[in-house]
């Protein structure tokens, strides 16, 4: 059944400034055809920048949000790309951090509320397919 979708991507990790984040959403109809394509990006620095501290204008709240028009389901991609390596080379001190992806439909029903563990060294690519398809 057709619905509008809202996607939120966020993390409370204090060194999230070391990463660029891209949220991509493909809105599809019941036939599987793309009817819209949306993207939101939180870009801090070019890959390889190796910043010592966060940029002066860095905002701690880096929630990415996309609201779609009406469609039958969505496919979601989230890219977490490190531009600056962790502050230490100690593997024990650089455990994965949490990134939360939430999706609601226009009835405010939760379709996804998932925590992903992101490797501090490599970042991650998250794929969620056919969100909103009723079984």
Question: Where on the chain are the PLM-derived regions?
Answer:
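Short, intrinsically disordered low-complexity segments
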Residues: 32-78
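Short coil-to-beta strand junction motifs in C2/discoidin
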Residues: 18-24, 89-100
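Short, solvent-exposed aromatic-acidic interface loops
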Residues: 113-125
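Short amphipathic, basic-aromatic surface patches that mediate peripheral association
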Residues: 10-14, 80-91
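Surface-exposed loop/edge segments in extracytoplasmic proteins
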Residues: 29-39, 107-114
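Extracellular or exported targeting regions of proteins
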Residues: 82, 113-114, 129
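Exposed aromatic-hydrophobic patches
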Residues: 60-66, 123-133
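Short, extreme N-terminal segment that most often corresponds to the first beta-strand
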Residues: 1-24
């Amino acid at each position: 059944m057709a619905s509008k979708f809202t996607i939120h991507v966020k993390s409370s990790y204090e060194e999230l400034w070391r990463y660029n984040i891209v949220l991509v959403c493909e809105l599809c109809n019941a036939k599987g055809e793309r009817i819209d394509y949306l993207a939101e990006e939180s870009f801090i620095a070019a890959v390889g920048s190796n910043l010592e501290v966060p940029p002066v204008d860095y905002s701690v709240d880096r929630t990415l949000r996309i609201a779609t028009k009406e469609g039958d389901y969505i496919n979601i991609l989230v890219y977490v790309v490190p531009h600056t390596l962790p502050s230490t080379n100690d593997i024990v001190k650089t455990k994965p951090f949490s990134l939360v992806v939430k999706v609601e439909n226009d009835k405010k029903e939760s379709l996804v509320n998932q925590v992903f563990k992101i490797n501090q060294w490599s970042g991650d690519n998250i794929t969620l397919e056919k969100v909103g398809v009723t079984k």
